[in-house]
From Swiss-Prot:
The lineage of its organism: Bacteria, Bacillati, Bacillota, Bacilli, Bacillales. It comes from the Bacteria. Keywords: Oxidoreductase, Pyridoxal phosphate. This is Probable glycine dehydrogenase (decarboxylating) subunit 2. GO terms for biological process: glycine decarboxylation via glycine cleavage system. Its EC number is 1.4.4.2. Pfam families: Aminotran_5, GcvP2_C. It comes from Staphylococcus aureus (strain MRSA252).
Length: 490
């Protein structure tokens, strides 16, 4: 591995350099020792980097220029919906009345903010077909866990606390079984059939008196619509279980079909994906949860309600599982999502899904002669191809993903779902042009040709990135996670 990386900010540090200039204080101060118990006081000086303001600005500007995001390149990361985030969202989120408000202000002083929360709840109820919505959860997995805790409370309140199993398809997101475990449930896997859909016979086998719920994404992670969803609903409901909708793939079906109409009892949405909150850098996200009326009394509190002409917090929720996020969640993402929904309207959201599905099927059709496509039917917003043909020449999907970096394209999701060998999951979203799609397709085809005729060229990629081929085995076995460890290595 060679590196053209920048020095760490700690390596730029020089004792005595400061990025600030403050006058000497004329206010009497007390010593730390007089204010805090000794157990709370550091014994050694904190090792903060000492750099001048110019060095600080240059350092982070240099790093920002090495970043990759949807604003500077194609980002077909499957199941992540890396669509363009309209800049009007940012303008609205920066309106001082919103950006300078505080969650501890009196309700009378933040009526505009509360109205946004209430209005977004109403919009999401309409989009999902749910009866009530909470915006509190901070991200998708947090929304999953919140919904499962609601299910748990519901079953316990009905004298069925023994229901401790959650059914998860073998193509599911990894967060599904993780959320189930975190909520105190056992995960039970249901197999996919030859079409990539839930195997109905296997579902009948695993459903029993201990079934609390099934977690489904529809379309599923293979990009395939579960056409037997109504039969799945009947099987699970007849067994006393509930249906949970993972909203990761809602971008494919807006204004086409709603989770509530498919029989789901709860749903989470990813505002940072479907509704254009910027994501990919670790947050903030937002994972609202919607439920049918039978579960509404279990939602986290407080809720925001409309009382006459005013908006207020409602803490009088009979069976509430309690608060799941400080204050009321990530408000800045609500502003961006609400702006997007109001800008697009119902017709616009429908066109979003139609374009997302069209783009995915266009790429799939053009690549089908060059890669193995395990599921031949039309896909929705994403699809999974397999690199097994290229593997015959010693080139794996991982190698092709690294080669894509040399062409200014972020690699798709690879080796997921787990039930496709050498899988590559591609989600172009609706915001990309045909020219961009063609560039990506032609690039992948050229890489497939390289794999056949010059495999070493692919195996040694990437060539143009700051860090080239990583020694991933050593990185996994001997991770260097802090500056102190780096100094020891050097």
């Amino acid at each position: 591995m060679t590196s053209k990386s920048s020095p760490l900010i700690f390596e730029r540090s020089r004792e005595g350099r400061y990025a600030y200039s403050l006058p000497i204080s004329d206010i009497k101060t007390n010593s730390v020792e007089s204010l805090l118990d000794d157990k709370f006081i550091r014994k050694n000086k904190a090792e903060f980097p000492e750099v001048a303001e110019l060095d600080l600005v240059r350092h982070y500007t240099e790093l920002s220029n090495k970043n990759f995001g949807v604003d500077n390149g194609f980002y077909p990361l499957g199941s992540c919906t890396m669509k363009y985030n309209p800049k009007i969202n940012e303008k609205v989120a920066r309106i001082p009345g919103f950006s300078e408000s505080h969650p501890l202000q009196d309700e009378d002083q933040v009526q505009g903010s509360l109205e946004i929360i209430y209005s977004l709840q109403e919009e999401l109820k309409e989009i999902t077909g749910m009866d009530e919505v909470t915006l509190q959860p901070a991200a998708g997995a947090h929304g999953e866990w919140t919904a499962l805790m609601i299910f748990k409370a519901y079953h316990e309140n009905n004298g069925e606390g023994h229901r401790d199993e959650v059914i998860v398809p073998d193509s599911a997101h990894g967060t599904n079984p993780a959320s189930a475990s975190f909520a105190g449930f056992k995960s039970v896997t249901v197999k996919s059939n030859e079409r990539g859909e839930v195997d109905i016979d296997d579902l009948k086998r695993v459903v029993n008196e201990n079934t609390a719920a099934i977690m489904l994404t529809n379309p599923n992670t293979l990009g395939i619509f579960e056409k037997n969803i109504m039969e799945i609903r009947e099987i699970v409901h007849n067994a006393g279980g509930l249906l949970y909708y993972d909203g990761a793939n809602l971008n494919a079906i807006m204004d086409k079909v709603r989770p509530g109409d498919m029989g789901f009892d709860a749903v989470h949405l990813n505002l940072h994906k479907t509704f254009t909150g910027p994501h990919g850098g670790g947050g903030p996200g937002s994972g609202p949860v919607g439920v049918v009326k039978e579960l509404a009394s279990y939602l986290p509190k407080p809720m925001v309600i409309k009382d006459g002409d005013k908006f207020k917090y409602d803490n009088d929720i009979k069976n509430s599982i309690g608060r799941v996020k400080p204050f009321y969640g990530n408000f800045g993402i609500y502003l961006r999502a609400y702006t997007y929904i109001r800008t697009m309207g119902a017709t616009g959201l429908k066109e979003v899904s139609e374009a997302a599905v069209l783009n995915a099927n266009y790429i799939k059709a053009r690549l089908s002669e060059h890669f193995e496509i395990p599921y031949k039917q039309y896909c929705k917003h994403e699809f999974v191809l397999s690199g097994v043909r290229q593997k015959e020449f010693g080139v794996r999907t991982l190698d092709m993903a690294k080669r894509l970096l040399d062409f200014g394209v972020h690699p798709p999701t690879i080796y997921f779902p787990l039930n496709v060998e050498e899988g590559m999951m591609i989600e172009p979203t609706e915001t990309e042009s045909k020219e961009t799609l063609d560039y990506f397709i032609d690039t992948l085809i050229s890489i497939a040709e390289e794999a056949k005729n010059d495999p070493d060229k692919v195996l040694e990629a990437p060539y143009t990135t700051v860090i080239d081929r990583l020694d991933e085995a050593t990185a996994a076995r001997k991770p260097i996670l802090k500056f102190e460890n780096l100094k020891q290595e050097k």
